A protein has these predicted regions:
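Conserved catalytic core of sirtuin-type NAD+-dependent deacylases
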Residues: 2, 6-302
Length: 302
């Protein structure tokens, strides 16, 4: 009609509508049941453990220990354990956040088949999730590199405190939460750990290693097989809090595509798998997952 003027769309309204539609897609995906979940560091930021590649990710400030460094250099191992000894206390104090608990509720209700996590903090199991595959291991376990005996991190911590009296107290008063990395260590200067003494295996005195997959290492075949089995029997794959930058996680998106399984992604920021997803939602998991659980389980109760 003559005389009418067109107005550009309200960007805030468009963004709100897009988020509402993405959440509706998330709700529909999970409501159908049979969902395998893949989680990354973004699920644990609400518990005070930073991620690697998010807006404030630790990779911007910290280069993680690689498998090659840890295995080839005794001094690198000592440095790792000194930094990890300080960081472990922060990780050990971390508790599941509402996002972890919401996933446990959805699994208990029969909507989720299980969780494959790239995290090493053990928070999914602590929240009550039953079928959890710790793809990259668990910081709460340590292994002897010589005899293969597995031990607990709690026992190692007691032995390290006895061998290094007062060491951890030097850093106890500082703002460690901002400095702890997702792999459980803390960025410390070499001069701060020069006198740190590492202990060996209590059985054979061999070198110890954490039961985690370092950067540059491969996921143990049996663990990978368990994760693939979970995905292969699922109706859908839901990726939560992972940028999918490393192949250990992205491979499951590729596998889902091969199987014709729909993929949904919830993450703060873009991911490597966005173009393969039926929806993406940029959201904080500790907020969106409790809402999802409340809507689905509340609807089931009615």
């Amino acid at each position: 009609m003559a005389g009418t003027t067109s107005h550009p769309p309200n960007r805030a309204a468009v963004a709100f509508y897009a988020r509402a539609m993405a959440f509706a897609s998330l709700r529909d995906l999970v409501a159908g049941g049979g969902v395998a979940v893949l989680t990354g560091a973004g699920i644990s930021t609400g518990s005070g453990i930073p991620d690697y590649r998010g807006p404030n990710g630790s990779l911007r400030r910290h280069t993680p220990m690689t498998y090659q460094q840890f295995t080839r250099d005794a001094e690198s191992r000592r440095r790792y354990w000194a930094r990890s000894h300080v960081g472990w206390h922060h990780v050990a104090r971390a508790r599941p956040n509402p996002g972890h608990r919401a996933l446990a509720e959805l699994e208990a209700a029969g909507l989720l088949d299980g969780v494959v996590t790239q995290n090493v903090d053990g928070l999914h199991s602590a929240a009550g999730s039953q079928r959890v595959i710790d793809l990259h291991g668990n910081l709460a376990r340590v292994r002897c590199r010589s005899c293969g005996v597995m031990g607990t991190r709690a026992d190692l911590d007691r032995r390290l405190r006895a061998a290094n009296p007062g060491f951890g107290l030097r850093f106890a008063a500082g703002p460690l939460g901002a400095e702890v990395n997702p792999d459980g260590d803390v960025t410390l200067a070499d001069r701060e750990i020069a006198d740190f003494v590492m202990v060996g295996c209590p059985g054979c005195e061999g070198d110890l290693e954490p039961d985690v997959v370092f950067f540059g290492a491969t996921v143990p075949p049996e663990r990978l097989a368990s994760a693939v089995t979970l995905l292969s029997s699922a109706r859908a794959l839901l990726v939560l809090g992972s940028s999918l930058a490393v192949m250990s996680g992205y491979r499951f998106v590729l596998r889902a595509a091969e199987l014709g399984i729909p993929v949904g992604i919830v993450n703060q920021g873009p991911t490597r798998g966005d173009t393969r997803a039926v929806f993406t939602l940029d959201a904080q998991l500790s907020a969106v997952l409790p809402r999802l659980s409340a809507e689905l389980l509340g609807a089931a109760a009615r």
